[in-house]
């Protein structure tokens, strides 16, 4: 999987790492698109940047997205508010790869204060190079979540009384 379009959004806590990731993606043949912050501002708030990156990723099938902040937690939550977005918090190479392979995640959240640059770039590389497995059991789970997102009706709990 090469030449991926990757939308990135970060607040002040992820700004410097986002800049490094953008350069790394360019050097490895990908097309990074910066959804902000476009300059460092210690008082900015992550939701706008993460929602912008997630919205653009969902609207561009086949693309991926990365949202960054201090921990990646709030950024992941913000991205997941976008209908159709599947954003996983990636804290290791393995979690980034599994986000793609098992969950067909289009986005990951990375904590800019949680990783060295080398660790973060390894997470990014795992995410952009791991293909979706297309395994039926994983697709079934994605479909259940998509149906809940569409209807707001929770799936039945197996074995629970009616």
Swiss-Prot record:
Pfam families, per database record: LacAB_rpiB (PF02502)
An annotated GO BP: D-allose catabolic process
Catalytic activity of the protein: aldehydo-D-ribose 5-phosphate = D-ribulose 5-phosphate
InterPro entries assigned to the protein according to its UniProt record, in alphabetical order: Rib-5-P_Isoase_Actino, RpiB_LacA_LacB, RpiB_LacA_LacB_sf
UniProt-annotated catalytic positions: 75 (proton acceptor), 102 (proton donor)
Single Gene Ontology MF annotation: ribose-5-phosphate isomerase activity
Protein family membership: Belongs to the LacAB/RpiB family.
Subunit structure: Homodimer.
The name this protein goes by in its record: Ribose-5-phosphate isomerase B
Lineage start: Bacteria, Bacillati, Actinomycetota, Actinomycetes, Mycobacteriales
